[in-house]
């Protein structure tokens, strides 16, 4: 399986990581180059999306770096978006930006995505996981691209924002499978809704006979620790009890200190749940 970034917004480069302070006025711009300080003395950072200032409105929330930094939009002028820092934090290079509840008018498949997919097709990838699928049309565009390039690879739709939840059933019907990508989903939606969204997604996939993957933060603590938390064990157990077809690791095995132990742990929990189901039957 190969991940395809999809419509993603990121900050640009900054000379060095700096701390945003609560209550600070801060600007997002497009085309300003490396971040720094504007003529009015307000610190700023560039974004990679020219339509950024057109998609959002005064009062909207801007989340940076997986929601660790929160800002509120105060004013918009041309390509400049002025914000107030609500939750402070360190800002480094190329941090991911989330705009909860905002429809982002980026293409479903960017030029960079097409180049990445071409490499995947040449390598014989079986599945492409398309990030930030918003509606069935996004999948139709991707299916056509694969067909035009003589690929029979299947598409896994990653649901990661409110628009995807609204169009959930239609997205599942148009895809070859679904991934509940809980990282961005937990940022874009109220966190208390996340378990309900996961259950609804799994149940809908079962009804439509489509495979479903539950992913992200399965064993997050094991990036640094050799043992899982009790909450993580219960989370994995419940995902399998709800009849998810797959549970997937990410950061745990890419940057974690205990990648093999993570695989062994999640497998052990899955097998225990399956033995319990067999005993009940």
Predicted regions and their residues:
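Non-catalytic helical/linker scaffolds that mediate oligomerization, partner binding
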Residues: 1-281
